[in-house]
Amino acid sequence: MTKEKRLIATNKTEEERDRLTEVWKKRIVSEKGYSETIAERIAEKVKSLADYMQYGHAIIAYYRQNGSFQLVTGTLISYSKDFHHSYDMKQVHSTFIFWCMEEKGWRTFLIENFLDWKPIV
């Protein structure tokens, strides 16, 4: 692949990620009533979480749909093995899936219920 083609592919990926951020922002604003600035911060944090969890473990804070607070350790390392295809963030429209280390199973949370995350190093 030439340098020019790689640059075009990288730009296309960035455009897709930006569109995804916009979709998540609209969802967060409509569901929670947050400002666009706060919604954008949340969307960016979810993107960085997804990027990190493909190769490592993270502590994730979020609310369940019933309102209970959750603080769990999660990862996406085994995603491709379990689902037989690679993780694609563009497929995340409203629900984020992850492997919960405590419960030893796949769990989800709604994007608008996400609070924060920290890497486990």
Name what the model sees in each region:
Residues 81-82, 103-121:
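Structured surface patches comprising rigid loops and adjacent beta-strands/short helices at the edges
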Residues 64, 68-89:
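Acidic, low-complexity, intrinsically disordered interaction modules
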Residues 89-97:
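Short aromatic-glycine-enriched beta-strand elements
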Residues 57-59, 95, 106:
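Short, acidic/polar N-cap/turn motifs at the starts of alpha helices
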Residues 60-62, 96-101:
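SH3/SH3-like beta-barrel fold
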Residues 2-68:
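Short glycine-rich, low-complexity segments
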